[in-house]
């Protein structure tokens, strides 16, 4: 305990650097063998977590954020199989930009966003239980909502898909892993209801690791079998 104030003293023993947010989605999509074209900004948001390794307990998080500006980009001319939007609502992506991207793309669209005013009629929207509770009632009835509920599984079109029972160490980035697997398996099978159980398996692997986690080749084989 710090003699200067009633707070713990931390001794640094190990430092790990991991990509998060949209970059975590990109890395996990690539782990499935998908070629990814990413639109993002140069500004960075750093989340520095302090973990007590003896008890696997997070003690503190410090956020370091550059001044965030809305994303400026030229739309790519290549052909793509899917559009994936990962938006933590930090200011990079406006609602107007999301609608523009969805209108531009001719194919399946997947959105994971903390915003509540989303184009639910034109895209698959992955949100968590807390985000779902904040939606307007008319949006809650959309057939395109994929609601992740942690240990209670995933709800889609009135059906619940059970979660995989594992020892949870850290849920950080698990939604990114779920989204990446969902996109890959949807492109493989063409059905969301077929892709969800596989995505649940991927998320179950992610939560057994600290911080954001990129699926290994072994993990991918486990998910897909």
Give the ranges of each region predicted by the language model.
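Conserved phosphate-binding/catalytic region of the ribokinase-like
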Residues: 66, 79, 96-121, 134-225
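Glycine-rich phosphate-binding loops at beta-strand->alpha-helix junctions
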Residues: 89-93
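A short beta-strand/loop micro-motif in the catalytic core of glycosyltransferases
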Residues: 123-129
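Structural motif
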Residues: 61, 82-85, 110, 126, ...
């Amino acid at each position: 305990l710090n003699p200067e104030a009633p707070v713990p003293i931390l001794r640094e023993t190990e430092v790990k650097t991991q990509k998060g947010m949209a970059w975590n989605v990109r890395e996990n999509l690539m782990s499935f063998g998908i070629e990814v074209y990413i639109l993002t900004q140069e500004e960075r948001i750093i989340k520095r977590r302090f973990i007590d390794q003896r008890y696997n307990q997070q003690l503190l998080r410090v956020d370091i954020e550059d001044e965030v500006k809305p994303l400026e980009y030229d739309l790519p001319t290549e052909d793509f199989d899917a559009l994936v939007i990962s938006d933590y609502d930090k200011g990079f992506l406006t609602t107007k930009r999301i609608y523009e991207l969805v209108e531009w793309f001719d194919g399946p669209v997947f959105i994971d966003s903390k915003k509540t005013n989303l184009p639910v009629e034109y895209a698959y929207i992955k949100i968590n239980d807390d985000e779902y509770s904040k939606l307007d009632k008319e949006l809650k009835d959309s057939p395109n909502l994929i609601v992740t509920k942690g240990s209670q599984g995933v709800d889609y079109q009135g059906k619940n898909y059970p979660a995989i029972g594992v020892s949870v160490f850290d849920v950080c980035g698990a939604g990114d892993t779920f989204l990446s697997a969902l996109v890959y398996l949807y492109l493989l099978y063409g059905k969301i209801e077929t892709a969800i159980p596989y995505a649940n398996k991927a998320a179950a692997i992610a939560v057994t690791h600290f911080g954001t986690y990129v699926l290994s080749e072994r993990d991918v084989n486990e998910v897909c079998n």
